[in-house]
Amino acid sequence: MTPSPLLLLLLPPLLLGAFPPAAAARGPPKMADKVVPRQVARLGRTVRLQCPVEGDPPPLTMWTKDGRTIHSGWSRFRVLPQGLKVKQVEREDAGVYVCKATNGFGSLSVNYTLVVLDDISPGKESLGPDSSSGGQEDPASQQWARPRFTQPSKMRRRVIARPVGSSVRLKCVASGHPRPDITWMKDDQALTRPEAAEPRKKKWTLSLKNLRPEDSGKYTCRVSNRAGAINATYKVDVIQRTRSKPVLTGTHPVNTTVDFGGTTSFQCKVRSDVKPVIQWLKRVEYGAEGRHNSTIDVGGQKFVVLPTGDVWSRPDGSYLNKLLITRARQDDAGMYICLGANTMGYSFRSAFLTVLPDPKPPGPPVASSSSATSLPWPVVIGIPAGAVFILGTLLLWLCQAQKKPCTPAPAPPLPGHRPPGTARDRSGDKDLPSLAALSAGPGVGLCEEHGSPAAPQHLLGPGPVAGPKLYPKLYTDIHTHTHTHSHTHSHVEGKVHQHIHYQC
């Protein structure tokens, strides 16, 4: 039967109400409020950049500046739950800031461009102790400017670890008026290595090659001119080849279950002396080796290498990486491995992904089956009955069309002539009809077109036993009664009962 239109209107709200609100809200992070992409800050002031994102589960936020991750080592920067706070803004703080929020269903980025304005008028800078000496000041001194670093984004990483035999470059590119000079020191002592005496155009970079353990220490660049001085310090750790292989910390990755077509993720945290290589692998199930161009062996099993995203450096010295799986299918189910490797070896940990079956498997449209069952019962019964009636009528017509016309009755026997095949009575030697004649019966000359028997010519007629291919069956019961009188003759009384059954 056809569903009611009212039911069709009420069905979607009922289905939506069957799911709890919490389940319906789960998904990737989304914006909770609008933001102004261009932010302006005054030199020396404090600026706050908001990251108004929300999601279920709550997302993990990470801030970057010009592509470099902001961590606790940045003294003037503080990552707060509401956003990023920058104190005592400097000129080099200008740049592109990105807040990236990630949960198990996806990620969202909020971008800012920070512009730093200098509200200090030229000529009001302190000129140093020698400014109080007498004499005529150079008119150009009114435009003097203290040195400043021009590439602060390349100086964020102040703690550097390198193995023996490697190299490192320390940069302190600066500008000012007059043109500043730079001096490199190690552990507060002037450098005597040849690397410190490079050509003028490379003086802003200190290159340390073929590192040795004694190269470990604090390296400081001091940039100065008549207007002032600035400095920056790097800590270099030269380690004797990595002492241990990476270690996977925490409980991740963990076994995960996802709905068909849903989104989920695995995460992996690796602790290593140097930045490790983190790679995700998926085990190739038996019989599916031909689907992949290349596989690798790990622990005696075959795995396929999956695309791996960025490796994030955390303030505690560990490294984090996530594997995102979208639009999960049955092929995505199986064992996944997080592999962390460095020059000393590798460590791995496995987890399983379970993909729930598709609640709506492909099949024939439901409307076709419902329309077939919605027919009224009289129609369902009447169609087969009509077909049977038409078929019976056709069969009857064919049966009548194949019947032959009436056959003429046989001629009566000549008087005094004994037909062959007659028998004698035991007592009176009277003639009796033969079984063949009786079996032929008086119905030999029946007209089959009318379906009624013709009157017999003679009970013992010798007519030939022949009939059409389609003929009525004749069953004859003969009851013979013999009465013996005192006279010498016998009387035969024959009673014939004919049962005619027409069969096509």
Swiss-Prot record:
> Which segments show compositional bias classed as Pro residues?
407-418
Stretches in topological domain Cytoplasmic: 400-504
The tissues in which it is expressed are:
Expressed preferentially in cartilaginous tissues and pancreas. Highly expressed in the liver, kidney, heart, brain and skeletal muscle. Weakly expressed in the lung, small intestine and spleen.
Entry's Gene Ontology BP terms = cell-cell adhesion via plasma-membrane adhesion molecules; diaphragm development; heart valve morphogenesis; negative regulation of cell population proliferation; skeletal system development; ventricular septum morphogenesis
Instruction: Say if the entry is tagged with keyword Secreted.
Output: no
Which molecular-function annotations from GO does this UniProt entry contain?
fibroblast growth factor binding; fibroblast growth factor receptor activity; heparin binding; identical protein binding
Q: Give the transmembrane region(s).
A: 379-399
Where is it found, in Gene Ontology cellular component terms?
cell-cell contact zone; Golgi apparatus; plasma membrane; transport vesicle
Here the segments flagged for biased composition (Basic and acidic residues) are: 423-432
Q: How does it assemble?
A: Interacts with FGF2 with a low affinity.
Q: Explain the purpose of this protein.
A: Has a negative effect on cell proliferation.
Q: What is this protein called?
A: Fibroblast growth factor receptor-like 1
The species is: Homo sapiens
